[in-house]
Amino acid sequence: MAVTLVIGGARSGKSRHAEQLVAATPSVTYVATGQPDDGSDPEWSARVAQHRARRPGAWSSVETLDLVEVIEGSAGALVVDCLGTWLTGLVDRAGAWDELGRAGAVVREQTTALCRALDAAGADVVLVTNEVGMALVPQTPSGRFFQDQLGTLNACVAAVADHVHLVVAGRVLDLSNAPLVP
């Protein structure tokens, strides 16, 4: 079983690429980590609709932040989209955006648990994530927290992944054989 991390910027094609990686797999579950679409944000609704329209009808879908549980219980391939919204959801669920120390503890605990589950995964798992480390350093504490925590999360997942693909402007770079930073 393989774990693949697909990382890229907004609208880079990373989700399409992740979906293509498992397109020939008979049993796929799409794991959406973003906030459910309640129709209150038309732009978000359009993004969700675009993602749904692209997926094969045979795929099952689940909306959850409980990634460890899903990974440990899966017999078929998983596409997790995406780790950035997962991290945001964890901090939202903890109500900790104003308590970044507590938020950091929650994220570290969940990151460790996720990486352990991925290391022991019994099915193919493709995870989509945002590359935010190439952007400007945010001016707000919560923005810097998010950027730093997502960078740490991405590095942890990349360390246990069999494959790492960077998607930039619709092009895929395979980083799977690139050395890890010690």
Model-identified regions with their sequence ranges:
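Portal/gating segments that form or line small-molecule/metal binding sites
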Residues: 54-94, 98-110, 118-119
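Structural motif
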Residues: 5, 79, 126-128
